[in-house]
């Protein structure tokens, strides 16, 4: 059993039984999870910023860093592994987008990331079935390949599922 660990700006998909797709310390970043329950395919992207036009060179180098590139790439990878080309049957969830700089989030990056992801999912004909977004705390996210359950944890707040 080998877990797939994603850093900021990374995306990945797993079909490995008994494993998880994980990302740590989501602050203003947003994680989008996609799960196909019949095929047991689990995918996630760890998005840092809403739009690649902010830094096109970075977008070419690390497309998962931006919502407008990373979310469609994750979906494309899910389809490549056998998911329906229109997203039928996919269970999509989103997490993160916190305002971690208490009272000093001038750019509202978390909120902008949340809105950008929702817009992109809408364009792809999907929407999240569950969300754990906003607030002012960091989250660690684990997506279970066998079940599609998403575990969330936060120091001082415990663990929960969405």
UniProtKB/Swiss-Prot annotation:
Keywords in alphabetical order: Chemotaxis, Hydrolase
Keyword Heme: no
EC number: 3.5.1.44
Keyword Hydrolase on entry: yes
EC category name: hydrolase
An individual GO BP term: chemotaxis
GO molecular function annotations of the record: protein-glutamine glutaminase activity
Catalytic activity of the protein: L-glutaminyl-[protein] + H2O = L-glutamyl-[protein] + NH4(+)
One of the Pfam families matching this protein, by short name: CheD
Function summary: Probably deamidates glutamine residues to glutamate on methyl-accepting chemotaxis receptors (MCPs), playing an important role in chemotaxis.
Family per similarity comment: Belongs to the CheD family.
Protein name: Probable chemoreceptor glutamine deamidase CheD
